[in-house]
Amino acid sequence: MKIAKSVLAALGLLALNGPVSGQSSNEVVITGVRFAYPIVEKWISDYKAINPQANIRIENRTITDPQKYDLLIEAYELNKEPKEKREYVSLGRYALLPVANAKSVFAKEYSEKGLTEKTYKQLFFHDIYAEKDKALPENYTVYTRLQKAGAPVTFAKYFGYEQQQIKGKSIAGADEHLIKALLKDETGVTYTTIGLAYDAKTGQTVEGLTVIPVDLDGNGKVSKEEKALGNREAWITALESQKVKNVPVEYIHFSIDRQNTNPEAKKFLLWVADNAEKDLHNFGYLKGESGRLTEDKEKLESLLRK
């Protein structure tokens, strides 16, 4: 009788406390880099249209990741340690472009001049040894991220620096907060993704921003053709069709812990790997290098069979 009462008491506690993980058995929690949320929301919507029983949600990342999640989105090249514990799918690539407040003196001048590597380094980085461009206007304000994040890490690494060497006003929050700060400051300059620089519906530059042209072939000057990349599709076409310089590009990685036992999370991730590519351009992403996604899918399928 005592044993029966103990079992009933234990079951009662479980009912009150719920699952240890805090998630229902078929709930999938996604977190990670916030500028990827719009395209992830599209994937969730499309997946639920054919799997209406699915319970998938995004939990916003703050300074740290949520305590419990199934899938993680990252936007920089990861080191060896996390790769040993997680299975990664590289879904597409994002590119970083210089932008300025459209009313700024900087935008008016450099929408014509464009940025070379020398100007880029002087504008954005603390480097006493970098070659200087004396023509830079005095009245400009650089904005950058405060916390470690994919975009600033990728941006700095491309030019040979660390994130902490990016100069300017550090803004807490996500990448879109840089854009909000810049739009309020008529001296503002920053770097951002194609998806944030261009309107999602029209593909044209977000109102109030100027995308600054850059020296794509590395010859030290910005040509008429390089200045003519005036919308989202033009940039994507240029970046996918040729090897370019002065545009940092990195993969968006979706990952799952190899010990994760949530079958719906694995199923959704595999579905995304099969269906993600058709949405990339509309959200400002480049397709990945040939063969990489196929290789990642094969590794993921192998994990699912275990």
What are these regions (language model features)?
Residues 1-28:
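Bacterial Sec-dependent N-terminal signal peptides
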Residues 23-125:
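N-terminal segment of the mature folded domain
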Residues 24, 242-306:
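Extracellular/periplasmic juxtamembrane helices and adjacent flexible linkers that interface
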Residues 27, 50-59, 137-141, 159-173, ...:
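A local structural motif
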Residues 35-43, 116-120, 151-155, 174, ...:
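Stable alpha-helical elements in mature extracytoplasmic
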Residues 45, 124-170:
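Ligand-binding cleft/hinge of the Venus flytrap
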Residues 148-223:
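Ligand-binding pocket segment of bilobal, Venus flytrap-like solute-binding proteins
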